[in-house]
A protein has these predicted regions:
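Transmembrane alpha-helices and adjacent helix-loop boundaries
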Residues: 1-364
Length: 364
């Protein structure tokens, strides 16, 4: 059905309201360094970092349905590149080099894995992370005779947080554009059926490698931004495989059907991991395994899928029981009306906005 002028007006108003709300939210988050304690700021750094990692991971894996465990490889490349070059280059120059190294590595890996899918792609990603970690350990022991690098730079926690927040905004914007573009539609078709995507004229190798590079660049930059937070970085810390598994679990817990889905996995898991690592450090891995089992058996579509199914069930009209007549039938009909989508504050703002900006036909 063709979109009417009223639909266009409402969609435009919703877009304006959404942009205004997101601007206020980002502004409030940007003020966190001046409002929170050192511990609170440290927690926010961890959470925003995982937001970047999870959304960047979902750009590739959420569309192509190829589960990547190479997150720790690119995250570690970004972190260790800064650690190696910080003594001979300015900080932002090390960020640029880390970005270039991450993109080049993603290009090589993307080309090598064009014909790999399923569990073989998962194993390759995990093996890549371990291979880079072992090569870095070998290099440090045999060439530099050390097992780590010191990172001393005037880049405090507030600056790290602000840069990560800006990176999170950018990766969300890229995801928003991707979901509304022909390229993003092609990626979704590749995830559904790669053979069909090729038959309709989509350049499958180019699309997969391109989105893999984009995802890897954001992951690498997040690792580079996190490097100044720690005074000493060693290969086992930088290329920790736990990062890859945590990101996957966060993404699946939140759900990949919506762009904001990963947030529903990042926020609760970051809070719980902070508590567990502080109070019960040896139970954290067991907890992650339990969460993954719950997702597989009970939440295959994540929290977003659960919310959508629940709302659909509430919106479905109830069937009329047999035997109800007269007033009882009328009462049941009122109770069984479908629940309409609440408009809330956004709806009130939209109505006010419509009064301020009337339809073109109403202008004099």
């Amino acid at each position: 059905m063709a979109e009417t002028a009223e639909d266009i007006r409402r969609r435009r108003n919703r877009t304006v309201v959404s942009i205004a709300a997101l601007t206020l939210l980002v502004g409030a988050l940007a003020a966190a360094p001046w409002l929170l304690s050192d511990y609170g700021l440290s927690f926010m750094i961890n959470m925003v970092c995982y937001v970047v990692l999870t959304v960047a991971w979902a750009l590739f894996s959420g569309t192509t349905r190829l589960v990547s465990l190479a997150t720790s490889a690119f995250f570690g490349v970004g972190m260790y590149t800064v650690a190696m070059l910080i003594k001979v280059m300015p900080l932002y120059a090390t960020f640029a080099v880390a970005l270039a190294v991450g993109a080049a590595l993603a290009l090589v890996v993307g080309v090598l894995t064009l014909r790999i899918s399923g569990m073989f792609f998962v194993i390759f990603g995990f093996g890549l992370s371990e291979m880079i970690r072992e090569l870095t350990v070998w290099w440090e022991i045999n060439q530099t005779h050390t097992m780590g690098r010191y990172v001393y730079v005037t880049f405090d926690a507030a600056m790290i947080y602000e840069h990560l927040l800006a990176l999170a905004v950018i990766v969300f914007f890229i995801g928003w554009l991707l979901r509304r573009s022909r390229f993003g539609l092609g990626l979704l078709l590749i995830g559904e059926d790669e053979a069909v995507a090729q038959q309709v004229g989509i350049n499958v190798p180019f699309a997969k490698v391109t989105i893999f590079i984009v995802s890897a660049v954001f992951i690498t930059l997040s690792g580079a931004l996190m490097a100044p937070r720690f005074g000493f970085i060693n290969p086992n810390f930088a290329f920790n495989p736990l990062v890859s598994f945590v990101v996957v679990i966060m993404a699946f817990l939140g759900g990949l059907q919506r762009l904001w889905g990963p947030l529903l996995g990042v926020i609760p898991l970051t809070i719980l991991s902070e508590v567990l690592q502080t109070e019960f450090p040896f139970w954290f891995s067991i907890f992650l395994g339990a969460v993954f089992m719950v997702i597989v058996y009970f939440l295959p579509r994540g929290v977003t899928g659960l919310l959508e199914d629940g709302w659909t069930a509430l919106s479905r009209p109830l069937e009329l029981p047999r035997g109800l007549t007269g007033p009882l039938r009328e009462v049941w009909a009122r109770l069984s009306r479908p629940i309409m989508l609440p408009r809330g504050i956004a709806g009130v703002i939209e109505d006010r906005w419509a009064k301020i900006l009337p339809r073109p036909s109403e202008k004099r």
